[in-house]
């Protein structure tokens, strides 16, 4: 079987409509290059100074930038602008406002001031706030994020912004993400500068590359399923005769209509200046992946949000529907969003790059030790920040990392860190090359890839695989940055007194690594994380196994994690409580919605399908006695009765849930009762579907869906 993957690397040699893509790359993005060209140089320098040194822009500078941005936007067909932000819901929001205004003489004029660029005022009353805001407290503010590029989609200029309440409470995910990067940078450079005397680091950037998985289904088939239309997941559906058993979809031939879809997506991404690196078929039928090149973490999150919007929009243009739910179809793999995490200094040093001699690479050893400690110490926080209720259907299903947080270093690095722990001499592998067929020898990677680990070292970065495909990467990276900062701060306190004595510093480096391994190496696993043996071993080691998102939230409630956010001002106690309540509300809303959809489908689709089958069988049985047909009739009849009972029970559970006021108790009730009942109901419905003839199945089956792209 041919293995195909479209890789663009940095050279865009695809022809679309006769134009070489590199000529159009970034034409819809008001990036640093365009700003430098459009602004008077002194104004550009003021913007750059404000960006680098976190200063406020004066009104004159803001007005000049706004004027240049407006002229550029108008020349590219924009008629409106919007402050674009990411509220606590995790879904981007905006309000379109027109450039056109009216002069004192009543004549039309295009206006856009520095004040309108820097600050906006959307209604904040209807966004999730976890109780921080009352409905009548409507005022909220958006503030321009100078670090991100503005861009044009359609006829709208989008300006990335931070969203806050009237009282200054954080109502979004961008602000805390930027703040968490700053505190990590502040602690990280102090450690780097202890060892790199010749190159002074004044800043560190968190660089993230996100790999987005998704499903594509035919639009007409999608429209015939209420569950797909409402929640993006099939809540009933028997397995297809052929699923992913043959592994013929993974990296296989991309269907022609999907190739056209990819082509359209690429064109939009390139115009926005987003580097689409790779695209390919994933494991499950109808499942695909796109990867975007590494960017500063806040820009990477923006790029991913834009990618998701473009994938959905472009799919519809191609008579397809793009699904981001982590588990839209049972019995085949679900989708994730792999978060590749690295930290780089202002002069390009990647602290997770082991180099040729990792044992003597002090910076590498310390930063990896910090990540080991952070991963183990904040397991529950990482589990929550990488997940959602919808991700529960994927985690731990022998297709994605289990719900247990573990770390894979690879055999070479694990041996290095264990040798330091045991205080034995580390012997580097002599032959670190690989010879391919008819090729020169090439360096061998320092680690294999463990797809079963929640966190895996992959050469010069750590890949966090738990992140759900529908979720923004903001929460996970905020948690990572803060947890890393916490560890790095303690490490620096140990090292700082000996900053002028490298011999003592070196001894302390090994001592710190040993201490971290003594306390936290339980989180390291080099085997099969899917296996029952690992689950039993993880339990013996005391690792958390939160099987559901709600279970992880419960554990988080009992674990004092807030200090890593509070002491550096990332969140206030009020904001942490609010975020926690928003997460609990998500549990309630998700399962309640699924329950309502299940009741509707039972009444309108599933039970009628069973009754239609009985109607067809009844005259045959009246005419001829057939023991097998009679048994089939009885099975379907009993299943219909059971499904009707399930429907009544779900209705009663929903009614009881609606009377619970406390959000924690409500989430617990919904998780323990409604979610459990929905799983049991599905089992009956799926078993009944297997007994129904094709002509009586009114819902598109898995077989129909999986063959809809060819």
Residue ranges of model-derived segments:
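N-terminal amphipathic/hydrophobic targeting modules at extreme N-termini
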Residues: 1-9, 14
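Gram-negative host-targeted secretion-system effectors, predominantly Type III and Type IV
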Residues: 16-19, 131, 138-140
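Active-site core of metal-dependent hydrolases
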Residues: 25-136
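Active-site-proximal loop/turn and secondary-structure-junction residues that shape catalytic pockets
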Residues: 61-65, 85-87, 115-116, 163, ...
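Hydrophobic/aromatic-rich, well-ordered segments within soluble, folded domains that form packed cores
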Residues: 78, 82-86, 301-317, 343, ...
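Short linear, low-complexity motifs centered on an aromatic residue
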Residues: 90-106, 125, 225, 232-234, ...
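Glycine-rich, acidic/polar active-site loops that bind/position phosphate-bearing ligands
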Residues: 137-324, 333-336, 343-583
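C-terminal amphipathic alpha-helical interaction region
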Residues: 516-710
